[in-house]
C-alpha cells in the first residue's frame, strides 16, 4: 500500500509520497515537481496535466482550469462568474451542477465539474503509480478550509470515480501545520503553555490564515479565516488590466477581443510578477501578439505595487478575523509561518509582517508544504506505515442546524436546533433525542447562509427516520436517538438511529469519594430509571452526493475515456516507431548493411521505404495502431534477410573475437603455468643444493695419523 498526499491546487497540483523514512515530492512525466491542474479535450483524446498546458493556447476553448473552484457549484453562483474570467472554456449547467462545454472527439460534449475533477484525479493516480510502481488507491487530499459540505462531497465523488479512496480531506493550512509540527522535537509538554503558530497561506486563488496551538504529539486548530478571491492570479489580473490599457493606447490593439492574446499576455504577466519579486523593474516583450504587432513594456516594482494596492489593502482582514475567532492578540502568537506561491510578492510579506510586528518564518517549502503535510496525514491514518503518533484536531467553520416539523402531540416543541457551532472540534458527534409516534424527517442546513461562499445553498441533507410507531405505554411515544456526525472529511451525515425505553434498574450507591456504600456484607443499591437501547431505526439520506447509479455510470464513462486515451497514445507510439524505423533502416542501408545486400535488394527496400513514407505523411497520418504495426512488419519482412546477414556477420565476428580471446587466454595460462613450473623446479634445485651443503657440514671429518 502506498502513502500518498496530494495538494490539489487551482493552478498546479503537487504529489508527495511517504517512503524511505521520509516524504518525497514526486515528479511527473516531464520531471516537473508540480503538475498543471488542467484538463483539455481534442479530436482524438484528452490532454491532462502537462499535455493540456502545452496545448492550452492553441486549444483554449477546450481547456478547463481552476477545477477545484468549480466543485459543488451551480452556474448561477456569482463566484462561478468570477471563475469564468480565469477559465477559457465555456461554463454551462450540467444537471444542476456547473460544468464545461467542449468539443471532444469531434462533437460537442458537456462535462460536470465532478467529472472534470475525476479526469484530473485519474491523471494524478497514473503519475503516482508510475513513480511508486504499485497500485494507488488510498490518499489524503487537501481542500480549502472554506469548502462547504457540498463541495467536499463533490471532491470525494470525483476521487471515487477515478478509483481512489481518500482517507481524509484535510484543510490546506491544517496540512501545512501538520507538516510543520510532526517533525518538531521541542514542542511544549501537556502541562505547559502551548506554542501558538499563525499559518498564512497565500495561494494562487485564495488566502487563508489559521491559528494553531501545538503541544507534544498534537495540534489543535483554534481558528481559520479566508479571503476566497485573493491570490496570485489576482495580481496577474491586475497586471493584465494595466497592459490591456497600455497596449490599447500605444499600439491600438484590444487584447480582450482575442482570447489567445489574453492568454499570452496573462502568461507574460505571471513571469513579470515573478521577476519583480526579485528586481526593481522588469521588461515585457511579446512578438506578433495581434495583427502581426510586436509589443513591449517596462514595469517597475513601484508601479506594480500601485496596481495591486486594492489587494494589499485587504491583507490584514483574514489575519484580524483569525485572531478574533481564536480570542487571541498579536502578542499571543509565537511564530508566523508563511507558505504559498503568492507570498513571494515582497509587498504581501511586508504587509503581513507589519500587521504582526514580528519577523516572518519561511522554514517550509512554500510550494510543497501542503502536499508533505497531506502525506504525513496519510501515513498516520495508514495501518501499514509506522509514524510518530500525532493528533490532529481541526474545527468546523460554519454552524449547522437541524430543522423539523413540529409534532402535533407536542405543541411547545422547538422546530430547529443548532447542533454544531462554529469552532467545534472536527470530527464531531452529537446525539439528538426525539419523541415520536410515526416516521419523521429532519433537514440539515447551514445556520448563517450569508457566511457561505458565493450563492451556495444552505441545504446539506434531508434524513428520513423510518420504523417509528406508537408504543404500548402511558405516553405511547417512541424515544428516538439520532447519531449526527461530521466526519474526518468535514461532511455531515446522520450515521444511525435507534430507539430506547425507560427501565428501572438497580444501581450501586456510592459515597462522595466514589466508594461503594455497603449494607452489611452487600453493596447498598437503589432503583433508578435508565434508558436502554432496544433496537435500530432505518435512516434514508438525501444528500448532494452522487447516487450509486450515477456514480457507476460516471465510472464507466471515465474508464472508457482512459482506454480511448491509451489507444491513442499507443497508436501515436507505433506511428513514431514506424517513422523512426524508416529513417534508421535507410541510413543503415548505406552504412552497416552496405556490403551485405545486393543493389537489387537495396533498391527494393528503398522503394518500399519511400512508398511507406509517402503513405505515412499522406493518408497514413491518421491510421489505426494495427495498420502501423502491419506496415512495420511489411518492411521487416522485406529487409529481414539483409538484417539477418548483418546479425550473422556480427555473431561470426563476436565468435571469432571470443575464440581469439579464449586462445590468448589459454596461451597466457599455459605460459603462466610453465613459468610457475620453472620457478618451482629452480626453487627445488636450490633447496636440494642447500640440503647437500648441510649434509657435508654434519659429516665426521677424516683423522690423519703419522706413520
Curated annotation (Swiss-Prot):
Keyword rRNA-binding attributed: no
A Pfam entry, by short name: HSP70
Positions of the UniProt region annotated as Disordered: 662-707
Comp. bias intervals (Basic and acidic residues): 662-692
SUPFAM superfamilies: Actin-like ATPase domain, Heat shock protein 70kD (HSP70), C-terminal subdomain, Heat shock protein 70kD (HSP70), peptide-binding domain
Triggers of expression: By heat shock.
Gene Ontology CC entries for this record: cytosol; nucleus
A GO BP annotation: protein folding
Keyword set, alphabetical order: ATP-binding, Cytoplasm, Nucleotide-binding, Stress response
GO molecular function, one term: ATP-dependent protein folding chaperone
Processing after translation: The N-terminus is blocked.
Location of this chain's protein in the cell: Cytoplasm
Family: Belongs to the heat shock protein 70 family.
Oligomer status and interactors: Binds hsp30 independent of temperature or substrate.
PANTHER family listed in its UniProt record: HSC70CB, ISOFORM G (PTHR45639:SF4), HSC70CB, ISOFORM G-RELATED (PTHR45639)
Protein name: Heat shock protein hsp88
Species this chain originates from: Neurospora crassa (strain ATCC 24698 / 74-OR23-1A / CBS 708.71 / DSM 1257 / FGSC 987)
Amino acid at each position: 500500500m502506498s502513502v500518498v498526499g496530494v495538494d490539489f491546487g487551482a493552478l498546479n497540483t503537487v504529489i508527495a509520497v511517504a517512503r524511505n523514512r521520509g516524504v518525497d515530492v514526486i515528479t511527473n512525466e516531464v520531471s516537473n515537481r508540480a503538475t498543471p491542474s488542467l484538463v483539455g479535450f481534442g479530436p482524438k483524446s484528452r490532454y491532462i496535466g502537462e499535455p493540456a498546458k502545452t496545448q492550452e493556447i492553441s486549444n483554449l476553448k477546450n481547456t478547463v482550469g481552476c477545477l477545484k473552484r468549480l466543485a459543488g457549484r451551480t452556474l448561477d453562483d456569482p463566484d462561478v462568474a468570477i471563475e469564468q474570467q480565469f477559465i477559457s472554456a465555456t461554463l454551462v449547467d450540467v444537471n444542476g451542477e456547473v460544468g464545461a462545454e467542449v468539443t471532444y472527439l469531434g462533437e460537442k460534449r458537456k462535462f460536470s465539474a465532478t467529472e472534470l475533477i475525476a479526469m484530473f484525479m485519474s491523471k494524478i493516480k497514473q503519475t503516482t503509480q508510475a513513480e511508486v510502481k504499485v497500485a494507488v488507491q488510498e490518499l489524503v487530499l487537501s481542500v480549502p478550509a472554506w469548502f462547504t459540505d457540498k463541495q467536499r462531497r463533490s471532491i470525494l465523488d470525483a476521487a471515487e470515480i477515478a478509483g481512489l479512496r481518500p482517507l481524509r480531506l484535510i484543510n490546506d493550512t491544517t496540512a501545512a501545520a501538520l507538516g510543520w509540527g510532526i517533525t518538531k522535537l521541542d514542542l511544549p509538554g501537556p502541562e505547559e503553555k502551548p506554542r501558538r503558530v499563525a499559518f498564512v497561506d497565500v495561494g494562487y486563488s485564495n488566502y487563508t490564515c489559521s491559528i494553531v496551538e501545538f503541544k507534544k504529539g498534537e495540534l489543535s486548530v483554534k481558528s481559520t479565516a479566508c479571503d476566497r478571491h485573493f491570490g496570485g492570479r489576482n495580481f496577474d489580473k491586475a497586471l493584465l488590466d494595466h497592459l490591456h490599457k497600455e497596449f490599447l493606447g500605444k499600439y491600438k490593439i484590444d487584447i480582450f477581443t482575442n482570447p489567445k492574446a489574453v492568454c499570452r499576455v496573462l502568461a507574460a504577466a505571471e513571469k513579470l510578477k515573478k521577476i519583480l519579486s526579485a528586481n526593481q523593474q522588469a521588461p515585457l516583450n511579446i512578438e506578433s501578439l495581434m495583427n502581426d504587432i510586436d509589443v513591449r513594456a517596462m514595469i517597475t516594482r513601484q508601479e506594480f505595487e500601485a496596481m495591486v494596492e486594492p489587494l494589499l489593502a485587504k491583507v490584514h482582514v483574514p489575519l484580524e478575523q483569525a485572531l478574533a475567532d481564536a480570542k487571541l492578540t498579536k502578542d499571543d502568537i509565537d511564530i508566523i509561518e508563511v507558505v504559498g506561491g503568492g507570498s513571494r510578492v515582497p509587498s504581501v510579506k511586508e504587509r503581513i509582517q507589519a500587521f504582526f510586528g514580528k519577523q516572518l518564518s519561511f522554514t517550509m517549502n512554500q510550494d510543497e508544504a501542503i502536499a508533505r503535510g497531506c502525506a504525513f496525514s496519510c501515513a498516520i491514518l495508514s495501518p501499514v506505515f509506522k509514524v510518530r503518533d500525532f493528533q490532529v484536531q481541526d474545527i468546523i467553520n460554519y454552524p449547522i442546524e437541524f430543522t423539523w416539523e413540529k409534532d402535533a402531540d407536542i405543541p411547545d416543541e422547538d422546530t430547529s436546533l443548532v447542533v454544531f457551532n462554529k469552532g467545534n472540534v472536527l470530527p464531531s458527534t452529537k446525539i439528538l433525542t426525539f419523541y415520536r409516534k410515526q416516521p419523521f424527517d429532519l433537514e440539515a442546513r447551514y445556520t448563517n447562509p450569508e457566511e457561505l461562499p458565493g450563492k451556495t445553498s444552505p441545504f446539506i441533507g434531508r434524513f428520513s427516520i423510518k420504523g417509528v410507531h406508537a408504543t404500548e405505554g402511558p405516553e405511547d411515544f417512541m424515544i428516538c436517538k439520532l447519531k449526527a456526525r461530521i466526519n474526518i472529511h468535514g461532511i455531515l451525515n446522520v450515521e444511525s438511529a435507534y430507539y430506547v425505553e425507560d427501565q428501572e434498574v438497580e444501581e450501586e450507591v456510592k459515597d462522595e469519594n466514589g466508594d461503594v456504600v455497603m449494607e452489611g456484607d452487600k453493596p447498598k443499591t437503589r432503583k433508578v430509571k435508565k434508558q436502554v437501547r432496544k433496537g435500530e431505526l432505518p435512516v434514508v439520506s438525501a444528500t448532494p452526493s452522487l447516487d450509486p447509479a450515477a456514480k457507476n455510470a460516471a465510472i464507466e464513462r471515465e474508464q472508457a475515456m482512459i482506454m480511448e486515451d491509451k489507444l491513442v497514445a499507443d497508436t501515436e507510439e507505433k506511428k513514431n516507431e514506424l517513422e523512426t524505423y524508416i529513417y534508421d533502416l535507410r541510413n543503415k542501408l548505406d552504412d552497416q548493411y552496405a556490403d551485405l545486400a545486393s543493389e537489387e535488394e537495396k533498391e527494393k527496400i528503398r522503394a518500399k521505404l519511400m512508398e511507406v513514407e509517402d503513405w505515412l505523411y499522406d493518408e497514413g497520418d491518421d491510421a489505426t495502431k494495427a495498420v502501423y504495426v502491419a506496415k512495420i512488419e511489411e518492411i521487416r519482412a522485406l529487409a529481414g534477410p539483409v538484417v539477418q546477414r548483418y546479425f550473422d556477420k556480427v555473431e561470426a565476428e563476436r565468435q571469432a573475437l571470443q575464440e581469439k580471446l579464449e586462445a590468448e587466454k589459454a596461451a597466457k595460462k599455459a605460459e603462466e603455468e610453465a613459468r610457475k613450473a620453472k620457478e618451482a623446479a629452480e626453487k627445488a634445485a636450490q633447496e636440494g643444493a642447500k640440503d647437500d651443503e648441510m649434509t657435508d657440514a654434519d659429516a665426521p671429518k677424516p683423522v690423519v695419523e703419522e706413520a
